[in-house]
Amino acid sequence: MQCGAACLAMIVNSYGVKCSLEYVSQMLHIGKNGVSMLAITEAANEIGFNCQGQLYTVEQLKEAQMPCILHWNQNHFVVLFKISKKEVFCIADPGKGLLKLTFEDFCRHWISTEQQGTRGTVLLLTPTEKLENFHIDKYHSNKSKHVLWKYILKYRYLYIMLLLGLFVGSLLQLVLPFLTQSIVDVGIKNQNIGFVWLILLGQLMLTISRTAIDFIRRWLLLHISLRINISLVSDFFIKLLKLPMSFFDTKLMGDLMQRMNDHSRVNTFLTQQTLNITFVIFTFVVFSLVLFFYNKLVFVIFLLGSILYGVWMTLFLKRRKVLDYELFEQQAINNNKTYEFITSMQEIKLQGCEQRRRWEWEDTQADLFGVQMKSLKLQQTQEAGSIFINEVKNIIITVVAATAVIHGQMTLGMMLAVQYIIGQLNSPVEQLMNFFYSLQDVKISLERINEIHQMDDENGKEGLQTSIEDKSEGIDIKNIMFKYDPHALRKTIDDVGIHIPQGKVTAIVGASGSGKTTLIRLMLGYYPVLEGKINIGNTDINKLNKKWWRRQCGVVMQDGVIFSESIARNIAVDDGDIDKERLLKAAEIACIKDYVMALPLKFNTKIGRDGVGLSQGQKQRILIARAVYKNPDYIFLDEATNSLDANNERSIVENLDKFYKGKTVVIVAHRLSTVKNADQIVVIDHGNVVEVGNHESLTAKRGAYYNLVKNQLELGN
């Protein structure tokens, strides 16, 4: 989904301007359906390019300015950097890396099926002077580099204890090759069984000491690991709760779950690999010095072999990074598909689409398997080379050491000690390379986590106010314009101006998709308007602390959520101690009290996914009770009674009419019975206000409102 952002970032960086993928992604406002070429064009213009979208033949493309962005396979974007004289096309694919394609392969991916197989879509980008002055320092903080230190320093004393344990353990391990040499060169050579037993007893004591140290180290490691993991995930959740709703509109559930898994990777790196690498480096340095002391030639052979091993392993780093990103995206899609498959079981069975939905899931598994196969091939190639280099190095060292023993340059005990040291050094070299791999993986994970932490909170710098000036002025909506995708042509809300009087009931009606729910979301501060202004009293909504503002509101949305908790906790969601009197009153107004009191556990009955199942009408009544329990000054109801039967709806509407006294109420509804008693009715059509009045005046006018309600019972004839 980020292929468009990656392509634009690559082109910007190719001109020597540093630009992160996160920054470009924010400029593009990438949604769940990806990004359009129009969005890429507008973002590129802002950065400093003149853009031109064209339908070109391959011959025209050869004359075009490069790098340029190509529409690939009708659903993807890539960058074309160069076309050689032999017609080899150099492509940068965000999902696959650098590719060199033949003329036939290139045409198969690029040529549009809608252009009779002759042309493809290309976005040409010409740099301007604006690009040279483009700075994004704000988005190039070193936070992702030093964020780990916050957690390490927090538990620095425990880390110091662990490091001491590691150093003591490695020092004890250092004694072992000398003991091995002593057994062979002194005990066995002199046939001194007492000396052999003494050395073996020493080895036993060393083993017991190392085991005890390792036992304590593991407990400390578990303690630190749990604490850091909780801190990491908790900080992530705190940040998520501060983000605007627009963020959640653009992210798949699977994407967020994958970022949660990234925290486990970071936690493992912090608590295990950072400590182990300290131990590994210490072991490597000390044993290398001992090996140098025993035989300089063996040391040189080992060093050259290790360098060759390291060079071989680093050749795969860049490709592994590309595959990691590809695997991340595919796992996110897979998680999302699996979650949807399980939670939609009822609808799947009702519609009889079991086979098709299963095939869709299997297609996702096939795509995931394809990426995993590419990772496995890369890993096998890497391992085959590393094993070959290591084995050749070990064989050469064995030959050199054996030759030295034969020529009297080394004793047999020294040779055994050298073999032990080589065995101990091979592991640190491998662990060092694994550490660099883990470091690369953690950098990728930190980039993804940091992308969230660097996003602006929904309150921004202005939204700190926790009071409303001149509340009696009601809510004033002044010529606002809004669209969910800033790059879209169609406006969801267009030049809407409404005054919602304080202490009165205002109903918003209109056909489905006309913008009613969006208007409520804007009044709740879900999204900033693109033009115009919303005032609560005389206070700009952008200056209000959004969390504080929503606490002043009782809200029932169409997609309200029932938590897996007791009925009482579902109604009093934000209260530390539940006010039983308010709880009963709220349940009574919502006409849910009789149902609850008939249950064995009454208000302590658990509902939601893990509890008692509820009908849609019962869910709506609990959501209404939740809004009433807050006893707010502002109430927003979005189709709050559309799942209720006529009798229950009539009773609840009558109860709410009494509850509304002195409160500012905004209702979105289709049913006439819900809106006809409103003090003011606003009719919206395609994002525009077309009528304002009360039920009597609008009915008499026989305009848009009349056409909406005329088929309902009271106006049927």
What are these regions (language model features)?
Residues 468-717:
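ABC-type nucleotide-binding domain
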Residues 199-210, 214, 276-325, 397-410, ...:
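Transmembrane helices of ABC transporter permease
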Residues 28-35, 41, 62-73, 77-165, ...:
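Noncatalytic regulatory segments and standalone regulatory/sensor domains
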Residues 159-213, 220, 292-297, 408, ...:
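Transmembrane helix-loop-helix hairpins at lipid-water interfaces of multipass membrane proteins
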Residues 245-246, 258-270, 274, 319-340, ...:
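An intracellular "coupling" helix at the cytosolic face of ABC transporter transmembrane type-1 domains
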Residues 1-53, 60-66, 72-74:
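Cysteine-nucleophile protease catalytic domains, especially the papain-like/related folds used
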Residues 330, 349-353, 377, 421-452:
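Cytosolic ends of transmembrane helices, especially the final helix of ABC transmembrane type-1 domains
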